[in-house]
């Protein structure tokens, strides 16, 4: 049996140009996203009625991890990056088919732009340019299980850090980008095995390099470059 051929229906534009700093799960940080359909699928009829839903599912491809192949076991960040578990017990990108699944907030469907229809949303956990393979509406009556167990994750987003972001540096970003950036930093983008309070990290966001340190549960932004 031949392998299925996936059609890329759209690509998402996000503030993240690199993998470092991208939220580990969707919905953790309200970062803006813009979904632009590929020309064969750029049809207003295809999204008719979608604006009635507050959230959507995005099925997408870990295109930057495909060349590295898959692994039966991985080391999830929630376990400190040292303990291995099965890949199917995680959302690791190193999967046999390299597919990702994200629930994001749908803010609006734009129909008056040159490349319309365009979807605007928040909460995506993807690098800018990531290929989208399918879009489905989120159905709260079918997709939400409040009593579900979370396995080794504990069922929550984990501890969030305090963010000290000097106002003059935060002002370098558009108003629509600021809250998402603060949330992404609060979610601790560092590899879990790195805990050096003297180390300066750099995260690209919105075309700028955010330089910061982490000490005693606080992210201290020290510079914004670019």
Regions found by a protein language model. Name each.
Residues 104-107:
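Conserved positions in beta-strands of structured domains
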Residues 1-99, 111-120, 124-226:
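Mixed-charge, low-complexity intrinsically disordered regions
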């Amino acid at each position: 049996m031949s392998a299925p051929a996936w059609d890329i229906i759209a690509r998402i534009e996000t503030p993240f140009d690199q993998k470092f700093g991208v939220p580990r799960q969707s919905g953790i940080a309200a970062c803006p996203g813009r979904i632009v359909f590929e020309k064969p699928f750029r049809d207003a009829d295809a999204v008719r009625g979608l604006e009635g839903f507050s959230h959507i599912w995005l099925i997408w491809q870990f295109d930057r991890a495909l060349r590295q192949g898959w692994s039966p076991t991985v080391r999830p960040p929630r376990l400190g990056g040292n303990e291995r578990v099965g890949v199917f017990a995680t959302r690791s990108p190193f999967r046999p088919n390299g597919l990702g699944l994200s629930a994001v907030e749908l803010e609006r469907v734009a129909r008056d732009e040159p490349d319309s229809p365009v979807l605007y949303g928040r909460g995506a956990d993807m690098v800018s340019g990531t290929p989208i393979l399918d879009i489905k509406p989120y159905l709260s009556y079918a997709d939400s299980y409040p009593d579900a167990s979370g396995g080794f994750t504990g069922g929550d987003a984990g501890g969030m850090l305090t963010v000290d972001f000097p106002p003059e540096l935060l002002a370098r970003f558009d108003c629509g980008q600021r809250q998402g950036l603060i949330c992404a930093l609060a979610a601790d983008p560092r590899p879990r095995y790195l805990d050096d309070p003297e180390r300066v990290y750099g995260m690209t966001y919105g075309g700028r390099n955010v330089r910061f340190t982490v000490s005693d549960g606080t992210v201290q932004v020290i510079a914004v470059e670019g």
